[in-house]
Amino acid sequence: MVGKMADDMVKEQIYTIPLREVRKVPAWKRAGRAVKEVRGFLVRHMKTEAEQVKLDKTINECLWEKGCEKPPLSIRVRAVKFADGEVQAELAQ
């Protein structure tokens, strides 16, 4: 996580986020909805506000890799929560 010091970390977790529900929306909205689902999942599980969740570029690239109509069914994300409540998420290796 660039920009924050390791001393400020409160919680670090790796999540597998299911995105099957995204298949129920119209095809041209799926990748955009998947981004919202990832953000919403992190808000629920890291107990913070949506404005404080920062998604890394690699998550966005993974969700849009096959186009807007075919996002992946699940995604593994490494999320770090800092003392000020900010959550930074990146694609897990």
UniProtKB/Swiss-Prot annotation:
GO terms for biological process: cytoplasmic translation. GO terms for cellular component: cytosolic large ribosomal subunit. Gene3D superfamilies: 3.10.440.10. Keywords: Ribonucleoprotein, Ribosomal protein. It comes from the Archaea. Disulfide bonds: none annotated. InterPro entries: Ribosomal_eL31, Ribosomal_eL31_CS, Ribosomal_eL31_dom_sf. GO terms for molecular function: structural constituent of ribosome. HAMAP family: Ribosomal_eL31. Belongs to the eukaryotic ribosomal protein eL31 family. This is Large ribosomal subunit protein eL31.
